[in-house]
Amino acid sequence: KIVEDRGSKIKIIAKIENMQGIQNLEEIITAADGIMVARGDMGVEIPLEEVPILQKKMIKMAVAQGKHVITATQMLESMIKNPRPTRAEATDIANAIYDGTTAIMLSGESAAGLYPVEAVKTMSRIAERAEQDIDYRGRMQRVKEDRQETPDITTAISYATCSVASDLNAAAIITVTMSGFTANMIAR
């Protein structure tokens, strides 16, 4: 609200890292341009077995509102000291992509790790391969079914755009937008 009142177009990403953030998640997603799923911090306050469940719910809620999601913390933690990730880490990255996260973030791996370049390249390879495997038509249908209310014009145009792009096997979608909202809705 403060940013809007001052006429700024700065995008706000809200870091969700504790129970208070989880309890206010819907309002936070609505108010922000996106969220960061800070799994490491969450794991300190929230039981470990709840973190993956909450991660999936947070991504789903943000995607439903056409908001960005950054999944972060310990994505390739083993690459701080090793040149290759664990298979579990590779699977974790792919699952975040399959769930609909719009960005994955390295922390210690690139800030203080012994293999920062390798970590970036590895994460990129895993993400790109996962993206190639996504059933985008199925994802679009699930997003459409998850919506509770009647779609507005932008949402209807977004679905139609994605459907036509899928039918034509389009390599890309280009959209004109003033605020980026239409592009975000198409991207989800």
List where the protein language model places each region.
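Non-catalytic helical/linker scaffolds that mediate oligomerization, partner binding
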Residues: 1-188
